[in-house]
Amino acid sequence: MKHTGFPAALIGLMIAACSPASEDSTGAPAPSADATDTSHTESMTSVAINEADLRHRISTLADDGFEGRSPATPGGIAASQWIADEMARIGLAPGYGDSYFQPVSLLAVTLEADQSSFDVAFEGEPLGLSMGEDVVYWSKLNSSEISVTDSELVFVGYGVVAPEYGWDDYAGLDVEGRTVVMLVNDPGYANPDSGLFNGNAMTYYGRWTYKYEEAARQGAAGVILIHQTAPASYGWNVVSGSWSGTQLDLAREPGQGTFSDIESWVTEDRARQMFDLAGLDFDAVTAAAARPGFEAVPMTGLTASGTLVNSTDTMESRNVVGIVPGTTRPDEYVLYTAHWDHLGSREVAEGEDGIYNGAVDNATGTAAILEIGEAFVGEPAERSVMILAVTAEESGLLGSAYYGENPIVPYEQTAGGINIDAILPSGRSRDVVVVGHGASELEDILTEAATEQDRYIVADPTPEAGYFYRSDHISLAKHGVPMLYADGGFDLREGGSEAGMAAGEDYRANRYHGPADEYSADWDMSGMVEDTTLFFTVGSRLANSDAWPNWYEGNEFRALRDAQMGTE
């Protein structure tokens, strides 16, 4: 998920003779000559970062021939094959043994809504929660039928266990077989000036993904997450739209992964009703949940029951991995990530456009990491550089999550990484926005490189929305690897902040996650070239140094990195 509410742009020498990456013959579609930038051919790309190369790669990836690059579809297979072929052509070594492909198995789970039910009852009387209107529920278990019966409800505040903040909402609590009810975001959001957590800036503990993970670790049978628009940073329409229909997850062997039986969201209105029935003052109890010393509260008389009938299917996709070997320390790595997938295509009326090309999101990022990879081939660094184009970001960061669980390079040999996700073609900016500002020492390298471009660093303007936790770098951060997530800013050199904000809003309102997100020859590529150069410079300095950046003191991932590197 991109931070499209942001203004403007927020939102090998040793393998010269390697063979092409054409490892399969799928009969999948190929880019159409009339839609790609045919003024610039693949054989003309240069090790110098430049506009023509970026245009060629973006226009190719965003072409109708790839049908929106949805994973495990003919278009997605063809797009990932093109990326692998491009890596081979420009001189990157295969990153997964002798292959450019790291296989990623995906599990598609479709809730059979007409055969499924989930409700909360008070003293045996169902509340009558309506799917989509009041509640959205699902299960990630690879099972055709999942049942929970008369599971007692308990309010666990924010559902957080954060030792570095001295916080444990599950302290002394046994939730085995029970259904936990919790708030979105973290205590710092409710008390931005209290010094709790990271104040108004969301931490990983505020993300819904963490909350479901922690509840499962605690043994909860069910999870009910209370939706509130401000702390979630999106309305109920996003919840009801995003968690209905087929859901994708990583396909795991039996016993792998930990999930509660049923996960759900409920509207605030219905949550207030539940609290009232349990004799609890919603405002008072939720306020107490944001203060140190909070203890979980049983929701007396309330139980949850449900039977979910699922149909499941396993699909195969792949991450695409290329490496530029290091000249003196090839076992140490700097990582670049971008997701290659988008939303595919939809059936529409004749004459309408049903292909979601994803030109900005994220043909731009994929093109940028290929451009950076080619630049490193021309200028190899002391450390190796890995170019990782991941699948299924739009389905929940699944490709990067798979890499996170199955790293090709040990984390203690990965010095750090840079994620590129959606670069708006709105021109050069005076600023660079760091999403999740104040996270890691990679920002020190970025600040120096940006200053040399006569640019300044600004913090993410809406830290409470937790955008740092919504793109692929988080899958590496969760395993301790310092990751940088930055974008060109909104203070444009032509038009200033007003023009930058207008460009960002125009994209968010008219093209983001829609069929209108298409490449245009009219794009102003100057900012994209500058940003890509900046990200190359940051990675090059790290790859040519002996530095091992860490997360800043107090960051939720610092302890992981310290343990990894033996610096506890």
What are these regions (language model features)?
Residues I15-A17:
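C-terminal motif of bacterial Sec signal peptides marking the signal peptidase cleavage site
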Residues A48-G95, T110-E112, A121-E123, D174, ...:
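Catalytic-core environment of secreted peptidases
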Residues M44, E67-D193, P298-T300, T312, ...:
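Noncatalytic luminal/extracellular "stalk/propeptide" segments of secretory-pathway proteins
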Residues S130-D134, E145-I146, A171, G177, ...:
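Metal-dependent peptidase/peptidase-like ectodomains
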Residues S19-S22:
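Bacterial signal peptide processing site
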